[in-house]
Amino acid sequence: MHQNVLMKDRFFIRVLLFILSIVFLAECAKRGRPEGGPKDEDAPIMVTAKPPHFTTNFREKEIKIYFDEYIKLKDLQTQLVVSPPLKYQPIIVPQGTPSKYISIKILDTLKSNTTYTFNFGESVIDNTEGNILHNFKYVFSTGDIIDSLKVNGTVKDAFEREADKNITVMLYEFNKEFTDSIIYKEKPLYVANTLDTTAWEITNIKEGKYLLVGLKDVAKNYLFNPKNDKIGFVKEVISVPKDTSYTLNLFEETLPFKLQRVAEAKKNKMLIGYEGEIDSIKIEPLFGPDDFESITLFEKTKDTANVWFKGSVADSLLFRVKTGNVIDTAKVMLRSKEIDSLQISINAKGVLNLRDHIKIAGNIPLQSIDTSKVYFVDKDTLKVPYSYQLKKEKTEAFVEIDFDKKYNDKYNLTLYPDAVTDFLGNANKDTLNFNFTTKKPTDYGNLYLTLQNVKSYPIIVQLITEKGELIEEVYATEQQEYNFTNLPPTKYLVRVIYDDNKNKKRDAGNFLQKIQPEKVIYYPTVLDIRANWDMSETFLLE
């Protein structure tokens, strides 16, 4: 009996110890506030560091930074900025688990007489409530002094309304070895990052002269790649110290034309892939045929040109590609026997806005229309007088139909067989019916815009949607009023482009040529256009 009691007591003690150990371990892992206690709203505090913060004559390979509570590192890969950049990424713990210290193992050979900054951004948080230790830095110098000068400023996008996040801002020392090509092949001396803001600050800089550059550094390698990266720069070399804040306008450089690939897509159609920005391509066969003709349209969203051609072409085509001052040659093998069938569409899908024309387009560029095979009537089946134009733009060739629109009316447009013909001679085989309506003027709004403080002409005034879709563009060479009428109710933006070189389009900058992008100014507020409403706005350009 006594033995049974002892066994039960021992079992009870073991169970109790097991439960207590689980509770203890859980509390150790959690390190949280007592249930019902006040919420912890304090950020972690650095207690000490080995070697100490602001150490000079630094020679260590490992740094340990201690805090007053358990911390975690969040988004360290994007938040941490080491200046000057290191060739090899340091090993940093903890990552994913809580700890009372940060360990940094340096794998590089450090530069002599240089101040290094480890800026953790917003990555250091406490383990329980996620309170952020904002802009936490650890600084040391391999020389006798800690450099203490700084440079700051903001970034903006040269064309878009909002700037990108995580812009890398860099300083290159301007010395006797300096060349502009340094940004393509060497890491900068000092760096900072805007993170999720538009502001930046580079600290712990030594006195001197520097090239100041900002990058949307896609590869995160501190090197400028014009194919992928946006760049902004200050044209003149800057001096530190100087009581100046700098704004970097980031843009994508326009790459020179480069032919990349040529392939047959269908019979009498080939694709030309290219690099760069171009407005037109001319195709010239090198060895005939004499009856060769072609038409080129560009894709809207990728660097590809669609080329339709006709003539007595055999099983291959050797041709010259000309664009501007660039000439290249290419060859395409012609094996396809299948030609595209013509497919017709119009822009009036349900409702035709009062400000729009009817646009008849095809998957193959349209070349003619037979008006005897077009039937256009209103809701009373009365014939609608119209005029038409054959138009070719950069991305499409189409038939545009204009007519006097009646308000709140219904229309039917019928294309009988052979009404429209494409570049290759195909015509629509079936009868095509398109029904659409118009609305009342009171269903639309109007915007009347006045510009003030225009520095120079010509300018390009654009009305766009919040998504960046171009609604209307006005090219102005002198002071005038800008009337945007019959606008569907939605939200719009206005931007003004200074066309400095008078080529009727926006031009980007170029780093090596030290050309800044043409200036773009957005109206500061979104314009909410409402039905049956006139809006008058004055835009003061700064």
Task: Please identify what each model-predicted range represents.
Residues H134-N135, D217-T254, M333-D340, L424-L432, ...:
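Structured interaction patches on ligand/partner-binding surfaces of diverse proteins
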Residues N175, K216-A219, E275, V454, ...:
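Short, flexible beta-strand-to-coil junctions
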Residues F257, P365, I369, V454-K455, ...:
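Compositionally biased, intrinsically disordered linkers/stalks adjacent to structured regions
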Residues Y411, L415, N486-L487, L493-D499, ...:
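Short beta-strand and adjacent turn/loop elements
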Residues N426, V454-I464, Y492:
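C-terminal structured domain segments across diverse proteins
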Residues M1-C28:
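Sec-dependent bacterial lipoprotein signal peptides
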Residues D9, E27-L215, K227-F233, E252-D443, ...:
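Acidic, low-complexity Ser/Thr/Gly/Pro-rich repeat segments typical of extracellular/periplasmic
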Residues N446-L447:
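Intrinsically disordered, low-complexity terminal regions enriched in Ser/Thr/Pro/Gly
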